[in-house]
Amino acid sequence: MQPLRPDMGAKRDEYRDGAPLMFLLREPTKERILHFIESQKALPFSYGRVGASREDKAPSGYVVDRYRVRLGEGPEAYVRAVQALRGWRQFDLGWVKLLPPDAPIQVGATVGVLARHLGFWSLNTARIVYLIEESGNVERFGFGYGTLPGHAERGEERFSVEWNREEDTVHYDVFAFSRPKPPLAWPGYPFARLLQKRFARDSKRAMVEDVARERLYQT
C-alpha cells in the first residue's frame, strides 16, 4: 500500500484502494480532503476486535494509552462537557483539524484528522464504532472510533466525559490502543508516539479550557 506522493497533483486513481494520504508538503484543499474521506466510507476497519475499547480492552500486541483530566463539578459542567465532545472540541488544537468539522456523533460517521507537522501535513481516516450514553450514579457520554485503511496506524480510541454524582466531579477520559501499520509506519513510529503524547496533552487542555470558557459565558 503506497502513500500519496506529496506533489499535490494526485489523480483520483490514487485513492482507489484506500491508500493512506499520509504525507503532504502543503495543506490539501477542502475538496481533496472530503474526496479522500468519501473514498473511505465503504471500506472495512483496518484492525480486529472492533469495539474492544468500550470495555477498556485491547488486542494482543497493541500499545495502550489512557489519560484523564478533571473538568469541573456539577451537572452544568457535565452538560458543557457533553456539548464539547459533540462539537469535537478535543480536536481544536491549532495543529490538528477534525474534518468535516460538523460531522455528527453517530455510529458510521467517517472523519478525517488533518495534522500539521514540521514541514509536512498528514491526513488519517477513522469511523465511529459505538456511542456511550449511560445514566445512574455515574452519567457518561462518549464514543469510540476506529482506524480505516486510510490511516497510518491500526487501532481504536474512545473519548468520553463522565459525571460522578456522589463525588460531584466531571472528568474527560480517553482510552486507546494502537500499533503502526507495516511496513510504512514502523520507521516513523517513535515520531508517531511523540505526536500521540502531544495530542493527549493538548486534548486535555482543550477540553478543560472549553468547559471553563462556557462557564464564564454563563456567569
Feature locations, PLM:
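Short, intrinsically disordered, mixed-charge
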Residues: 82-90, 150, 166, 205, ...
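Hydrophobic ligand-binding cavity/cleft-lining segments
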Residues: 3-5, 11-118
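A short hydrophobic beta-strand element
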Residues: 107-108, 139-145, 170-174
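A conserved amphipathic terminal alpha-helix motif
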Residues: 33, 37, 181-219
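Residues that form or immediately flank small-molecule/cofactor binding pockets and catalytic motifs
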Residues: 52, 133, 179
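Hydrophobic residues positioned within well-ordered beta-strands of beta-sheet architectures
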Residues: 65-67, 111-113, 126, 143, ...
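Beta-strand/loop substructures that line and gate deep hydrophobic ligand-binding cavities in soluble
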Residues: 147-194
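Hydrophobic-ligand binding "helix-grip"
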Residues: 11, 118-166
